[in-house]
Each structure stands twice: as structure tokens, then as C-alpha cells.
Design a protein with these regions (language model features):
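Bacterial N-terminal signal peptides that target proteins for export
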Residues: 1-7
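N-terminal signal peptide c-region/cleavage motif recognized by signal peptidases
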Residues: 9, 14-16
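Intrinsically disordered, low-complexity regulatory regions in eukaryotic proteins
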Residues: 19-89, 93-109, 113-216
Length: 216
């Protein structure tokens, strides 16, 4: 059985096959100080983009299974991104700022979405509204870290194999794990987001092997 754990590629930057807009860097770590990201227009036409930041509620899962909470909906957000909108000429680069508002107790992961927006006026201009077409969006990854960081992992055996959980306050990178003798790619486990690893025999370095219900 293929292990249910999401490998490291599951929590990555979401990019279309081609996009005029780019982010540098695409993976950002924020501590107590503000960080900046460069938004680049690689296209040959002006771009108007909207920017949103959302907390990832279940980091470590496949991209399609991610659950997001917009920071704008939070009563007391810990991180803020500004500006919300910007216009970029062809080849232009502008700076986006990520500012921590409050310290976090555990590592918190966000999606930073930059969406190009094109206004379409049509044959008749309407004063009250305008049609809007949204091009392919670009999504970066932001990790906000606590001041004091602890890495720890627990492994709980169950009838399907094992369940791994980060018991520290930051992500734990699991390397060298095997399922039924087959090596897994390295993967991250995040605090508050345990992952199942299914198989007859699940071996996580530093922990006793787990045997699924079909194992001995």
C-alpha cells in the first residue's frame, strides 16, 4: 500500500507552467523581524496584481487538500503582508513586505498568493461595475517561526502502520524512513498536523518499527 504520508514535494510552491509574475524568494522564513519579497513582472505588458496571505491549517498535505484561512478573517493575525495591490510595468520589480505582528508559539505556515488581474471594459463602460479576468496566480510559502525552537517527533503505531507527529514547536524533517523495506523521500511533519504512514512494516529512524494489521 502506498504510504499516506505526504512527501516533501507536497508542501511546495504552487506555480503555473508559464506566468509573467514571479516571486523571489519563493520560500520565506520570518522570525521577529520583517522580511521582504520581490514581485517581478517578466511579461511584455503591464500587470496589476492583488496580494493575499492565508494561514495553512494543515501543512504537509498534498496541494489540492490544503485548507486555508485568510489572514484578513483572523481576529488577531500574527503576520501581515503589504501592500495588498500593486501595478508593475514590463520588467519591473517591486517589494512586498511581510511584517510579524505577534510572536507565535509554534511554527505557522502561510500561502502568499499573487494574482494578476486585468480589467475588461468591453464595448460599453459601466460606472457601477467592470468585468474582471484573473490570470494564473502564483503562490509562495511563508513560515513564521517562534523565538525558541524545539524539534521532536513521536511515532504511534496503529493497525494501518504508524502515525507521526511533531511534538516540538517547529517542523520535524523525517529522513531515512522505510515502508515495507522501501525507502521514502524525506518529508516534513508540522506541529498540530500529524501524518499517517501506512504499510505492513513502517520503520522511522530512532523509533521502534510499527507493524500494520496485515503485518506479523
Amino acid at each position: 500500500m502506498f504510504p499516506a504520508v505526504c512527501l516533501v514535494s507536497c508542501l511546495s510552491v504552487a506555480t503555473p507552467s508559464f506566468a509573467a509574475i514571479d516571486l523571489m524568494p519563493k520560500d520565506v522564513t520570518v522570525d521577529a523581524h520583517a522580511m521582504t519579497v520581490q514581485v517581478v513582472n517578466n511579461g511584455d505588458r503591464p500587470e496589476y496584481v492583488s496580494i493575499s496571505l492565508s494561514r495553512l491549517l494543515n501543512p504537509g498535505v498534498p496541494l489540492d487538500d490544503e485548507r486555508l484561512e485568510p489572514v484578513s478573517d483572523a481576529a488577531r493575525p500574527s503576520l501581515y503582508a503589504f501592500p495588498f495591490r500593486m501595478s508593475l510595468a514590463p520588467g519591473q520589480t517591486k517589494t512586498l513586505t511581510l511584517k510579524p505582528l505577534h510572536p507565535v508559539d509554534t511554527e505557522t505556515v502561510y500561502r502568499l498568493d499573487v494574482k494578476p488581474v486585468v480589467k475588461v471594459l468591453g464595448a460599453e463602460k459601466k460606472a457601477t461595475s467592470a468585468s474582471v479576468v484573473v490570470n494564473l496566480a502564483f503562490s509562495g510559502l511563508v513560515r513564521q517561526l517562534p523565538a525558541r525552537q524545539r524539534e521532536a517527533l513521536s511515532v504511534e503505531c496503529d493497525e494501518l502502520g504508524a502515525r507521526v507527529a511533531a511534538t516540538g514547536n517547529v517542523r520535524y524533517r523525517v529522513e531515512g524512513a522505510k515502508v515495507d523495506g522501501r525507502a521514502l523521500d524525506a518529508f516534513n511533519v508540522y506541529p498540530g498536523a500529524p501524518l499517517p504512514v501506512n504499510g505492513k512494516v513502517v520503520a522511522i529512524p530512532g523509533h521502534p518499527a510499527c507493524h500494520g494489521r496485515t503485518g506479523n
